[in-house]
A protein has these predicted regions:
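A compositional/biophysical signature of low hydrophobicity enriched in polar/charged and small residues
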Residues: 1-163
């Protein structure tokens, strides 16, 4: 549930998972510490914030023998939302968001200049869905956290009553 509803309260998560609030709190903190939960974000509608044009830009270095530092060379370009290393004809695929075709053209020039690459661009026409969280069994994920260390459940009368 947290992967789908990041603002869910520990009380509601505990109710749905059949655990005590203190056990859920400990387990979620452990999942954060272990790197299973890597953060919480607010997803903004790109059109509402003035970035209606999404494109995927495949990049390939001109010099195949050059060091593979393309992600670092492009990190300063905030219009690049994601950078994926891929197998195939290109080395990386970038997901970019900009306000207009003119801004996309400018961004492509910046990418080419900063990284010494050729580009191939695909413009997104519509997005039926994105940012889909994986389907996870809440209890299984929380139990995984409990398996990684001690838990308050043993001493929690609410959980003891459920057994």
């Amino acid at each position: 549930m947290l992967s789908r509803f990041g603002r869910m309260s520990f009380t509601e998560l505990a109710r749905q998972a059949g655990l005590s609030v203190s056990a859920v709190h400990q387990r979620v903190r452990r999942l954060e510490t272990e790197g299973v939960i890597t953060g919480y974000v607010a997803l903004c509608d790109p059109e509402v914030i003035g970035l209606p044009l999404t494109a995927f830009v495949s990049i390939k270095p001109f010099d195949a023998a050059a060091p593979d530092d393309l992600p670092e060379r492009l990190r300063h370009l905030s219009a690049i939302e994601a950078c994926h290393s891929v197998a195939g004809d290109e080395n990386y695929i970038l997901k970019v968001r900009v306000a207009s075709p003119v801004e996309l053209e400018d961004l492509l020039q910046q990418i080419r200049a900063a990284a010494g690459v050729s580009t191939r661009t695909t413009i997104v026409l519509s997005t039926p869905y994105e940012n889909r969280p994986p389907e996870l069994d809440n209890r299984a994920v929380l139990d995984m956290a409990a398996d990684q260390g001690g838990d308050a459940d043993e001493d929690d009368p609410e959980v003891a009553d459920q057994a």
